[in-house]
Each structure stands twice: as structure tokens, then as C-alpha cells.
Regions:
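Conserved beta-strand in the GNAT
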Residues: 58, 64-79
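A short beta-loop-alpha structural element at the N-terminal edge
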Residues: 2-24
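Conserved acyl-CoA
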Residues: 96-111
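Conserved GNAT-fold acetyl-CoA-binding loop/helix
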Residues: 28-46
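A short helix-loop-beta-strand connector motif used in the catalytic cores of GNAT acetyltransferases and
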Residues: 46-58, 68, 109, 144
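C-terminal "cap" of GNAT-fold acetyltransferases
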Residues: 139-154
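A short, internal acetyl-CoA/4′-phosphopantetheine-binding micro-motif in the GNAT/acyltransferase core
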Residues: 79-95
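Conserved beta-strand-loop-alpha-helix junction that forms the acyl-donor binding cleft
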Residues: 108-127, 132, 138-142
């Protein structure tokens, strides 16, 4: 599976150096989502997510600078955190991202997670990727409203 990662533009395998670079630069909405779900600092949440994920991609711009990070756990929980600079490559990212999601859905028949109801960019991304919003409930350490999302590969 990891050998096939090289086929995707704007994605490369993540490193711990990427986490250190991205953590202080994350979007306000992503920092708020991290705080609401886990009560962690951005660095701690990224590091923990990196360790718990089977595969983690760094999203890079045309200069190969990290602008986001994206992963999937062994159980199929998909996640994405980004900087404001992701908007600079939004169209090419979305096009390529759909290929990555389809690729991941060949290994994981069910992709899922929770998204903060206030994180409109993540909600748009999940809809673009074909996720269904199946539940709205209080979630995380701050008990904020989140949507439960799922994408099933037929």
C-alpha cells in the first residue's frame, strides 16, 4: 500500500518534522476541533494521530512546503488538519484527494470519523469526498456538537 503513495500529487508520506512544522500553523478551526475532542495541544494531537495511524500523508504545495496532514487509523478513522495555505492549492488538492480517498476505500470498506459542526471547511471536504452525515451529537472532552460521518465502499 505505501509504495502506491508516490502516485499522488500534493501528497507524500509524513514525517515527525512535518508535525513540528505544521502544529503551530494549523487553522484556528482545526486547533479548536483538537481542543474540543481531545483537550490536547496541536503538537500532541498530531503526534498521537501520527502514531495511531496506519498511513499519514503530508499535503504539500507547489513549493513542496507542508500545508496540511491527513491520515487513517487501522480502524478506518480518517482525519485531516491543515494550515490556511491549503487554500492556495485547493482545486488541485481536491482533485487529487478524491483519488487518495478512493484508494484508501479499497483497503478500508468503511471510512468514518467525527467532525466539529463549526468546522465548515472540513464539512465541505467530507461532502466532496462522498461522506454521509449520519448523526449529530455532543462529542469530545468539551462535549461540543459534532457530526458522525461515514463513507462505505460498495
Amino acid at each position: 500500500m505505501l509504495q502506491q503513495v508516490q502516485e499522488f500529487n500534493h501528497f507524500r508520506l509524513a514525517t515527525l518534522k512535518d508535525i513540528k512544522y505544521l502544529a503551530p500553523r494549523l487553522r484556528f478551526e482545526d486547533k479548536r476541533e483538537i481542543l474540543s475532542t481531545a483537550g490536547m495541544t496541536p503538537y500532541t494531537a498530531l503526534y498521537y494521530s501520527y502514531l495511531k495511524s496506519e498511513i499519514v500523508f503530508t499535503i504539500v504545495n507547489t513549493k513542496k512546503e507542508p500545508v496540511g496532514i491527513f491520515g487513517i487509523t487501522v480502524g478506518g478513522a480518517i482525519w485531516l488538519l491543515a494550515t490556511d495555505k491549503l487554500k492556495d492549492i485547493q482545486y488541485s488538492f481536491l482533485k487529487e484527494n478524491k483519488k487518495v480517498i478512493d484508494f484508501l476505500n479499497t483497503k478500508y470498506k468503511i471510512l468514518w470519523n467525527f467532525v466539529d459542526c463549526r468546522n465548515s471547511l472540513h464539512i465541505k471536504w467530507l461532502k466532496w469526498c462522498g461522506f454521509k452525515f449520519i448523526n449529530k451529537k455532543k462529542y469530545g472532552v468539551l462535549n461540543e456538537p459534532f457530526y458522525e460521518v461515514i463513507r462505505i465502499c460498495a
